Amino acid sequence: MTLGQFGGLFVVYLISVIFILSLTWMEFRRVRFNFNVLFSLLYLLTFYFGFPFTCVLVFRFGVEVVPVQYLLQAMLSATAFYAVYYVSYKTRLRQKTSVPRAPLLTVNRVEANLTWLLLALIAVATVGIFFLNNGFLLFKLRSYSQIFSSDVSGVALKRFFYFFIPAMLVVYFLRQTQRAWLLFLIGTVAFGMLTYVIVGGTRANLIIAFALFLFIGIVRGWITLWMLVAAGIFGIVGMFWLALKRYGLDVSGDYAFYTFLYLTRDTFSPWENLALLWQNYDKIEFQGLAPIARDFYVFIPSWLWPDRPNLVLNSANYFTWEVLNNHSGLAISPTLLGSLVVMGGVLFIPLGAIAVGLVIKWFDWVYELGKNDSNRYKAAILQAFCFGAVFNIIVLTREGVDSFVSRVVFFCLIFGLCLLVAKLLYWLLESAGLIRQRLRRMRATPLAPTPNTVQDPVIKEQI
């Protein structure tokens, strides 16, 4: 990359970032937080945050990168995708109505508490089983890729660890105090550190816990944008340190700076992977929607499907094995746009942008239902569901459409199953006479009795 080429890329980069940041800032000032703001920030992080790191690696350390024309193509396609996405998100599909509708879901106090207990039980039980089978893998494995080897049993259990976070989200949304907010951080980060040590380097639970803590703080006005920036810097440094421990690296001096640059870029902003796909575009055999179906294979236990393929050719594995010819055992993220390119080439990019806009709109609709519901238990469940799905939005931007679809379906099934079981348990307990009504009197300022006033309203709660 020459200085002239860098200058041209920088102009395109600046225009793209200003365009996306302007739209995101307007939305932030309007609503402070919604899933459009979240997706936009994650999109900026994935496709634009890594450009400065790439430039420093090129000019400071002489690292060879993808030819400039493909880097430019990656930037332009990312910006075009966001423009189509934004139009799709903002397009109203039906007229807004103020007519109240009958609630599709009702949740009481007992059901809400049973739901978070079941979610937490799933997470803790699967962590316990994984630990009994494998011990502390962080101190046993020589490389991170060994996690996926036959020596490690119960790898599928890792997918259940995450449900501890939605459980703690329900607890927080039932109270929504600063104390509950801080306890959420302490509990989820402690659990994330435990899973990091047991699994041998999986940082996802830690990243999500910290990110959700920050998002809740922004929504409630407990942290400012400057505090968010400081927390982001702290998070980047923390993730770099954990990556060093994961890969067993001992670095110092210039090499430490070099390692920081490429690990941080690859962790938060694998945008060069999209450029690699454009470079190898003529070699790609478009997979259609097959990667989405194949990604569900990993959720089917081998005892249920004895002939299940051990190697799943989703978009990440296709990119890693067929495009990069990399068989190290780790799948390399193709990004959201990369997965669309693998599935259907250029034509799938605008179609994917429209679909993503509708998905984000749906999450915002559910989130608004939760915020505005008068039943605080139902509101807590809906908001916890939406915030719990943040991990799936991260998967969408970083890993791709196929990984997102399989994980969001899995998340909805487990969350919905826990709520259904909670309702069934409540019905059984109530039928057995173990649920009693708690009468709570609303204290009001004494007023002179009038024919139209009602003294001491009574509210019933199940305990």
From Swiss-Prot:
The keyword Isomerase does not apply. It comes from the Bacteria. It is found in: Cell inner membrane. InterPro entries: WzyE. GO terms for biological process: enterobacterial common antigen biosynthetic process. GO terms for cellular component: plasma membrane. Pathway: Bacterial outer membrane biogenesis; enterobacterial common antigen biosynthesis. Its main location: membrane. It is a multi-pass membrane protein. Keywords: Cell inner membrane, Cell membrane, Membrane, Transmembrane, Transmembrane helix. The chain crosses the membrane at residues 6-26, 39-59, 65-85, 112-132, 154-174, 180-200, 201-221, 222-242, 340-360, 377-397, 408-428. Belongs to the WzyE family. HAMAP family: WzyE (MF_01003). Probably part of a complex composed of WzxE, WzyE and WzzE. Probably involved in the polymerization of enterobacterial common antigen (ECA) trisaccharide repeat units. This is Probable ECA polymerase.
